[in-house]
């Protein structure tokens, strides 16, 4: 009799995922309370792509899996110059406002909250100055950071939009 050996190779994803928040949510029904879990997950490749999502499920593990899959479908590309961002930007979402400023090499991520720091680490930005204004709820801060990152443009993109050409020393 021939034995068949199967090798299970775990698929390695180029994306790193971090769970920002897990909370138990409750639905009150006629017979009592129904409990589920909600997970907020950020996914990035530490080069230039980032995405986030929330998902709910009966078990924590299932909620995280669902959120990771959703986040991978919503990835966006961010322009990065070296280890920082090309210019100042402000992101808005709801009552949250998030200011991002480029910083010199070696500064690190100066961010007040864990949610914003997670997003910036996973997108691949290692030198940036930030300030959060207004609401500091983790989901609102993440959405404000993402809005700010979406507004970033490189020199080349701005020049093209304005119909200009860059000098050789500016490139």
Curated annotation (Swiss-Prot):
UniProt GO BP: translation
Pfam families assigned to the protein according to its UniProt record, in alphabetical order: Ribosomal_S5, Ribosomal_S5_C
Record-linked InterPro entries: Ribosomal_Su5_D2-typ_SF, Ribosomal_uS5, Ribosomal_uS5_bac-type, Ribosomal_uS5_C, Ribosomal_uS5_N, Ribsml_uS5_D2-typ_fold_subgr
Single Gene Ontology MF annotation: structural constituent of ribosome
Segments passing through the bilayer: none
Domain S5 DRBM: 15-78
Keywords noted in UniProt: Ribonucleoprotein, Ribosomal protein, RNA-binding, rRNA-binding
Matching PROSITE patterns: S5_DSRBD
Superkingdom: Bacteria
GO CC list: small ribosomal subunit
NCBIfam families for this protein: rpsE_bact
Biological role: With S4 and S12 plays an important role in translational accuracy.
This protein's domain notes: The N-terminal domain interacts with the head of the 30S subunit; the C-terminal domain interacts with the body and contacts protein S4. The interaction surface between S4 and S5 is involved in control of translational fidelity.
Subunit relationships: Part of the 30S ribosomal subunit. Contacts proteins S4 and S8.
Protein family: Belongs to the universal ribosomal protein uS5 family.
Record's protein name: Small ribosomal subunit protein uS5
Name of the gene this protein is made from: rpsE
């Amino acid at each position: 009799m021939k034995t068949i050996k199967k090798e299970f190779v775990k698929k390695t994803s180029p994306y790193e995922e971090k769970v920002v928040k897990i909370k138990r949510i409750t639905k009150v029904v006629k017979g009592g309370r129904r409990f589920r879990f909600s997970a907020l997950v950020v996914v990035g490749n530490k080069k230039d792509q980032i995405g986030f999502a929330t998902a709910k499920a009966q078990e924590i593990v299932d909620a995280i899996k669902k959120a990771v899959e959703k986040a991978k479908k919503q990835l966006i590309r961010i322009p990065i110059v070296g280890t920082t961002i090309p210019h100042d930007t402000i992101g808005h979402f709801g009552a949250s406002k998030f200011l991002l400023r480029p910083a010199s090499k070696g500064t690190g991520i100066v961010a007040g909250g864990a949610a914003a720091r997670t997003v910036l680490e996973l997108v691949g930005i290692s030198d940036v100055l930030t300030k959060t204004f207004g609401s500091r709820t983790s989901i609102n801060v993440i959405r404000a950071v993402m809005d700010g990152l979406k507004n970033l443009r490189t020199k080349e993109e701005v020049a093209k939009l304005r119909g200009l050409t860059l000098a050789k020393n500016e490139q």
